[in-house]
Amino acid sequence: MATFFLIMIYLSFISLGLPDSLLGAAWPVMQAEYGAAFGMAGVINIVIASGTIVSSLMSGALLKRLGTGQITLISCLMTAAALLGFSFAPSIIWLLALALPLGLGAGSVDAALNHYVATHYQAHHMSWLHCFWGVGATLGPIIMSGFMHDHDLWRNGYFTISLIQFALVVLLAFTLPLWKRMENIQSHAVKESQAQPSRGRSEKMLQTKGVKLTLLTFLFYCGAEASVGLWGSSFLVNVKELPAALAAVWVAMYYGGITVGRFITGFVTFKVSNRILIRSGLLVSFAGASLLMLPLPTYYSLIGLLLLGLGFAPIYPCMLHDTPERFGKEQSQKLMGYQMAVAYTGATFLPPLLGWLAAQTTVSILPFFIAFYIVFMLYGSERVNRIMKQRIAQSETI
């Protein structure tokens, strides 16, 4: 039963990743069909992100009322319905309207599943789950490209992805009693965490020492990851003078580094703690950014991108998994939603900000900003580690 339940969570993470890259993959064809401005894709993406941020912030209260199983079911149903709507949308206005439920569904299920896995499973599952998200994010454009290869049938691509999501909805509906049973079996762990006064239970969450630094670390991590993905090709073409097609392949290898790195990290967590992995990942990624900054032969840029991907790989899942350990299981339920909201905020707004600055100056500023983000993350992470050590020491003296 436990194995089947875990398989359902893994499938949910693949499903979570499937829609994330669809708009970018299909937009050149969608733009021509609708006669829309090139930048309209960014507007649609902001609406999706806004829905995701709102539902992430609400996830703590929703989890208490509905539980993880029902949240996952409802969220996947919203996502499936929105994707189906995309496949029939007659105008841009419809796409904008459907973007909101697409974002709302994604944010709730992301926060709910991350909290559940962080609370009830070991660190390797968190790394592998985010690796499976990468599988979904990779499969989405592949499915879409299959329909657009000869006939530009982007609507069929969205329709197919929606059918996959609806299939998951059916599975979740049939297994809803299993979710409730597993949550009841594992609820004693939450009760134990509520008995730990050292976690600052009586404090308002945002006033808890270390929370704001943690949230800023999530903001800069997702901003850095998304910025490299969005502007990496432009940097390689304009600064390193690579052909556009080759630059796209090198950026794909950056994402491959993240996905493969998370798979490997899952095994490493058996021997190495989350905090050491976060620290190591930040140092490796800083080395990657440094290679992009320096006036070295072009192939060093590929090594730099691979190091960025491999370095980024453990940071996000390990920070998520460390949340209950750092702040207590009771507080982590709401804090996980805050972390998701801040993460999506960073991924949504920091890349356009960097793009605007690059337009005013030069895209060669990319690795310098990424290095700055990494340095801040390292400072924030190490500072929170010291705060946690002080808190543990104080609780032991009481």
Model-derived segments and spans:
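Cytoplasmic helix-loop-helix junction between adjacent transmembrane helices
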Residues: 98-132
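Interfacial helix-cap and linker-helix signal at transmembrane-aqueous boundaries
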Residues: 30-31, 62-63, 143-152, 236-237, ...
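Conserved MFS/SLC helix-loop-helix module at the cytosolic interface between two early adjacent transmembrane helices
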Residues: 54-93
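Extracytoplasmic gate region of multi-pass secondary transporters
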Residues: 23-24, 209-252, 256-259
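Helix-breaking motifs and short loop linkers at transmembrane-helix boundaries and internal kinks
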Residues: 35, 67, 88-93, 241, ...
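A late C-terminal transmembrane helix in Major Facilitator Superfamily
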Residues: 326-363
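Helix-loop-helix hairpin linking two adjacent transmembrane segments in secondary transporters
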Residues: 128-181
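Helix-to-loop junctions at the C-terminal end of transmembrane segments
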Residues: 55-68, 261-273, 358-359
